[in-house]
């Protein structure tokens, strides 16, 4: 990145920020879709039941922990690969 001029660095930063936002929104969408379809079965009420709320909380926690672990493993792999 040191070899890029200021304009190129700014463009690269914008591209990376847009990609990061897209990935975040994709993760949020996946989490929402998965947890909703796994936990919400009763559509007779406009509010979530206690059981549904607990299920969604557990589902979201599990999903986020899994995503964090995958990120850690990727970072470990990348560090090992770059060290070769």
From Swiss-Prot:
Cell compartments where the protein resides: Mitochondrion inner membrane
GO CC field: mitochondrial inner membrane; mitochondrial intermembrane space protein transporter complex
Tagged with keyword RNA-binding: no
UniProt xrefs under InterPro entries: Mito_inner_translocase_sub (IPR050673), Tim10-like (IPR004217), Tim10-like_dom_sf (IPR035427)
Source superkingdom: Eukaryota
SUPFAM superfamilies noted in UniProt: Tim10-like
Disulfide bridges in this chain: 35-59, 39-55
Biological role: Mitochondrial intermembrane chaperone that participates in the import and insertion of multi-pass transmembrane proteins into the mitochondrial inner membrane. Also required for the transfer of beta-barrel precursors from the TOM complex to the sorting and assembly machinery (SAM complex) of the outer membrane. Acts as a chaperone-like protein that protects the hydrophobic precursors from aggregation and guide them through the mitochondrial intermembrane space.
Subunit structure as annotated in this protein's UniProt entry: Heterohexamer; composed of 3 copies of TIM9 and 3 copies of TIM10, named soluble 70 kDa complex. Associates with the TIM22 complex, whose core is composed of TIM22 and TIM54. Interacts with the transmembrane regions of multi-pass transmembrane proteins in transit.
This protein's domain notes: The twin CX3C motif contains 4 conserved Cys residues that form 2 disulfide bonds in the mitochondrial intermembrane space. However, during the transit of TIM9 from cytoplasm into mitochondrion, the Cys residues probably coordinate zinc, thereby preventing folding and allowing its transfer across mitochondrial outer membrane.
Family: Belongs to the small Tim family.
Protein name as it appears in the record: Mitochondrial import inner membrane translocase subunit tim9
Organism: Schizosaccharomyces pombe (strain 972 / ATCC 24843) (Fission yeast)
Gene designation: tim9
